[in-house]
Amino acid sequence: MTRVHRDFCRKATLFTATVLLLSISRGATPISGADDDADRTSGRAGGIWAEIRVIDSDTGRGVPLVELETVNGLKFVTDNAGRVAFHEPGLMGREVFFTVKSHGCEMRKDGFGFAGVRVTPRAGEISNIKIKRKNVAERLCRLTGEGLYRDSVLLGHKPPLPDPLGPGGVAGQDSVQAAIYRDKVYWFWGDTLRMSYPLGLFRVAGATSPIPDAKDPKSDPAGGIAYEYFVDPKSKFARAMMPLAERPEGVVWLEAVFTVPDQRGVERLVGWYSRRKGLEEMYEQGIALFDDAKEVFEPAKQLALRETWRRPSGHPIFYEDGGTRWLLFGSPNPNVRVPPTLQDVLDPARYEAFTCAKAAKGEKPAEPDLGADGKPVWRWQKDLPPVDSKTEQQWLKEGKLKPEHARFCPADAAAPADRVILHSGSVRWNAYRKRWVLVAQQTFGKPSFSGEVRYAEAEHPTGPFGRAVRIVTHDRQTFYNVCHHPFLDRDGGRIIHFEGTYTNEFSGNPEKTPRYNYNQILYRLDVDAPALRAARVK
């Protein structure tokens, strides 16, 4: 390139940039096709506050967990109704550019690659920003924690919950368990954060709520769930549901909550508990029963620490096999069963594992048992440990199992040559699809290592789950211990709801989303959505 050519190119570039910058300074959109300015209307916003609301471009519904950031780094996150109550004295009545981003949603970029919109915030006015949902599942609301409808309250709106700022004094809450018991939904969570001190409750928190009526629009969980927490009468903060006061060392986790009859035929609320030093090391484990008079769980049977599978786990389901009723355990794939009575649940000798292993190496399956046709020989038995998604993935990697024979390690519907390793989730019967549907967290996923959620189907609860469709994605945030609640299903099972723990833990991302971090977020999914066709079992 000659010097003349270089000078011409340099001047042309400067001229183009100058025109674009001048157009921006005058309030024009720099490149055709970029997002328009926010729609402004007079509305309910009152006092000193300007209302900025982010809405789904398809449904018109407010979108929670949307981050708006100004050029100078001020960040705002929408509440459960998709609202931000805005009052920055130096920015009112002035045009402000907000970068807009949200997990599983997108905002079109302008000519410079900025995904955002210009807003002129004025007290008493509403600015609507439209965003496009890319997730198959729709994010509805944050279920736990403080300030659920914080911005809506400031703006004078009436939220759908009796306590819109967060019941139970809870700041953060981890990993849900739920069961219908005595005409209520009983909810239990793991570690629970409080606002009054960095150390929270580490001995199980609990709450109840009415059983929702699928035909009653008022019981639609889209706006949240009206939890009635079990609280300490003095502090009003969530109290311990499994105190174990005589054994104060360690934290207590409660999992696999379900109901079964005892020897008198009385329904009992049961769960597996562990008292632990950390994520891996346990002090003790066992089966716990709910004491209705004390309203706490108490140990009913302690299990040997070396016992890894002859116990409840995951989100239990009931099913029939050959006319015999069973209780199934496993997360996300059901691979352990026991007769559904309290007496059987308390007896490790009554548990059976679903396996295709030839032998065990320690407490893990060693290699697959293949028949004369080269297919794995699956069976229920009492001696060998169960096979799960992680085991199948290892066998696939080692060439010991053919991809078409995988049962718990489905193909990625978008890239069938790749297999999806499932970490936690649930399998439920779906009356609309007339299939067992799996909603589970993927591990070793992208763009988030543990924040991608998958949907798959099977004719049996134990699979095979052939293809999995991504229904939720996160940008370097984690979404784990996913659970689909069948009692929240609507429209005959066409609409299902699931939740999970949203956090920056295990993501490699140091940024914590204010109020949302380490809390439960609810999604709904239309199982008839065209995007799920690749996962359907015909």
Residue ranges and their predicted role:
Residues P30-A50, S57:
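Beta-strand-rich domain onsets/edges
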Residues G73-E88:
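Short, acidic Ser/Thr/Gly-rich low-complexity loop/linker segments typical of extracellular
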Residues G47-A50, D58-N72:
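Short, ordered, surface-exposed loop/turn motifs in non-cytosolic proteins
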